[in-house]
C-alpha cells in the first residue's frame, strides 16, 4: 500500500481509528445502560440535570442482549462489537474491571501525527483523551473546577447517592 516502512504508519492509524470505534461503542452502550434514570426521583436544582420528561427514561435494558442484537447484521456490526458482546455476556455489570483504560501508544502517535500534518481528528483525539481521563489524572482539575464554582457562585458540590 506504500513504500517500505509505510506499513507501521498505516497500522498506527488503524489503531487510532480503533480507539475511536471502541469509545463510540462504550459511549452508546453507556447511554442505554443509564436509560432507567427516570425510574427514580431526582432532586431538581442547579447541580443536577433535570429530566424534562422523566417518562422517556424509564427503560431497564438488557445491555448484553442489545450488544448481541447489534452484532448480528446491524450497520455497526464489527469484530470489536463481537468482543464487546462476549465481554458483556461474561460480566454484564463489568464489575471485574476498574475502568482505567491504557493506551498502547499508537493512538497517541496518530494524534501527534495529525497535529504535525495539520489534519483534524476530533474523534480520535477525544478517544485518546478519554483514556487519559479514565486513569484519574484529571482528579485535581475536577476538584479545582468545583472549587472555582464554589468561589464565584457559592455552588457546593452535589454528592451522588450511592
What are these regions (language model features)?
Residues 18-19:
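Glycine-rich phosphate/pyrophosphate-binding beta-alpha loops
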Residues 1-12, 23-29, 33-162:
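NAD(P)-dependent Rossmann-like dehydrogenase/reductase catalytic/cofactor-binding core
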Amino acid at each position: 500500500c506504500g513504500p517500505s516502512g509505510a506499513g507501521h504508519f498505516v497500522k498506527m492509524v488503524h489503531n487510532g481509528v480503533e480507539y475511536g470505534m471502541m469509545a463510540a461503542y462504550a459511549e452508546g452502550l453507556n447511554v442505554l445502560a443509564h436509560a432507567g434514570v427516570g425510574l427514580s426521583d431526582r432532586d431538581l436544582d442547579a447541580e443536577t440535570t433535570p429530566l424534562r420528561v422523566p417518562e422517556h427514561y424509564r427503560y431497564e435494558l438488557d445491555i448484553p442482549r442489545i450488544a448481541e442484537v447489534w452484532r448480528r447484521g446491524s450497520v455497526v456490526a464489527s469484530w470489536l462489537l463481537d468482543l464487546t458482546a462476549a465481554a458483556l455476556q461474561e460480566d454484564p455489570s463489568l464489575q471485574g474491571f476498574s475502568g482505567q483504560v491504557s493506551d498502547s501508544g499508537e493512538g497517541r502517535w496518530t494524534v501527534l501525527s495529525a497535529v504535525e500534518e495539520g489534519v483534524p481528528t476530533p474523534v480520535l483525539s477525544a478517544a485518546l483523551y478519554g483514556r487519559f481521563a479514565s486513569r484519574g489524572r484529571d482528579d485535581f482539575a475536577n476538584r479545582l473546577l468545583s472549587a472555582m464554582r464554589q468561589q464565584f457562585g457559592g455552588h457546593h458540590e452535589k454528592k451522588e447517592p450511592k
